[in-house]
Structures are given as C-alpha cells and as structure tokens.
C-alpha cells in the first residue's frame, strides 16, 4: 500500500510542477531531468537514482505529447532536499530501473506520467559459493 501512495504522491507532484513549466517548447533532456527529479523526491529515506541513458523518440512531431523512455541506476547517496544525484557515484551492483511514461501538454493542463520498474535483465550479482563435489573426510 505504501508503494501505491508513493506513486500517487509522485504523480500529483509531477502534475503540479508541470503546470508551472513555461509555455516554450521543452527539450527532451529537460523533461527527463524533471521526471527524474520528481521520481527521486518520492524516494525519501531511500537511495537516489541517477540517469544512465535516455532514448529520445525518433521524432518529436507532437508539441503536446512527449513519450519518455530512460534508464536510471541507484547511487550511494540517500535522499535529502539539497542533494543532487549528479554529484553521487553509482552504487556498485546498484539496482537499475527502466522508466517509461509521457509528458503531455495541452492548453492549461500539463501532466507527466512515469513508471519505473526494475530492469529484469540486470539482476543483482550475488557472490557465488562453491562446495566440494564429493564427500569430505
């Protein structure tokens, strides 16, 4: 249930801040940076995440809808109001997440939806324990 509240708080925060964005056309990188900032604000008491890579759409024909697709990775820093993830090193073996969503801008309404799921292709590495194959004497 706490996870649902966290997502809801992040979405409401994104919608509120998205309304404050000026009417100029935003670059893809700016939208991704804002999405990551709000995602991290929902991580209170948890490690911050930093951008690994962003995949812009092939073309941004639409001025009103920008699809988002980027990967983030856990850092060694814990969330505080003044901490910037860009100043934090990636955590060795840290969790990676794939984020997808959209930034939508219509006349008076601006909203950003975002979902970040664990990257199943990158399972955490655990130390391997080897045991002797035969009986021990």
From Swiss-Prot:
The keyword Disulfide bond applies. GO terms for molecular function: cysteine-type endopeptidase inhibitor activity. Disulfide bonds join 77-88, 99-116. Its main location: secreted. It is found in: Secreted. GO terms for cellular component: extracellular space. Belongs to the cathelicidin family. Binds to bacterial lipopolysaccharides (LPS), potentiates strongly the early antibacterial effects of BPI. Inhibits the late lethal action of BPI. Coiled coil: none annotated. SMART domains: CY. Residues 1-20 form the signal peptide. The keyword Disulfide bond applies. This is 15 kDa protein A. It comes from Oryctolagus cuniculus.
């Amino acid at each position: 249930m706490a996870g649902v509240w966290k997502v809801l708080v992040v979405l409401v925060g994104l919608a509120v801040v998205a309304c404050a964005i000026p009417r100029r056309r935003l670059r893809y990188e700016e939208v991704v940076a804002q999405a990551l900032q709000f995602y991290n604000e929902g991580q209170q008491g948890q490690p911050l995440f930093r951008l690994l890579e962003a995949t812009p759409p092939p073309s941004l024909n639409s001025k009103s809808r920008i699809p988002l697709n980027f990967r983030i990775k856990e850092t060694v820093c814990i969330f505080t109001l003044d901490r910037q993830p860009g100043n934090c090193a990636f955590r060795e073996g840290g969790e990676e997440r794939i984020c997808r969503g959209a930034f939508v801008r219509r006349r008076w309404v601006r909203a950003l939806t975002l979902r970040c799921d664990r990257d199943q292709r990158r399972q955490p590495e655990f130390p391997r324990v080897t045991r002797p194959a035969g009986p021990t004497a």
